[in-house]
Amino acid sequence: KVKAYFEKQMPVAGCCRVDKRESSPGDIALYICQACRETLEDKVKTQSMWEYLDALKDFNFPNLNGQKFYVQDCWRDRNHPEIHEAVRSLLKKMHAEAIEIEHNREKSIFCGNLHYETDDPRLKNYPNTPLYKLPEDLQTSLMQHYAAQFDPQIPVLCYCNRCYECL
């Protein structure tokens, strides 16, 4: 539904690693992925899709009838309060409830298989190493440790592809 809406409104590009289209002065690149934001923000003005959707007056949001969601704020978005606000505003527009976790918003410590701030002593052997480069058993253990904070009966809302893939 969202993709179809955007395709009617504007040209839709794919991943910035593959789609290398040029931008013109005044263009705004809407992004979903934090890596795309980081790639594009020096070339063109950027805005998250969440902010854009939140500002729409004509979008028909679904009614989620009070469904509760844990909100997993991405570590790569810790300095982007506009995204935190837009995601929560969208949940309200859909009649859903955000459950805030301890390390949320600017205090986020997790980005899927990229980053996790934890005091696990096993990480001392891997300084400044992205999680995806760690031994698989250690990655699994760290993901399980992080995910243990969530009640499995309540969905976790992730707006980062890495967080989503790992949770």
What is the meaning of each model-derived region?
Residues K1-L167:
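Iron-sulfur cluster-binding electron-transfer modules in prokaryotic oxidoreductases
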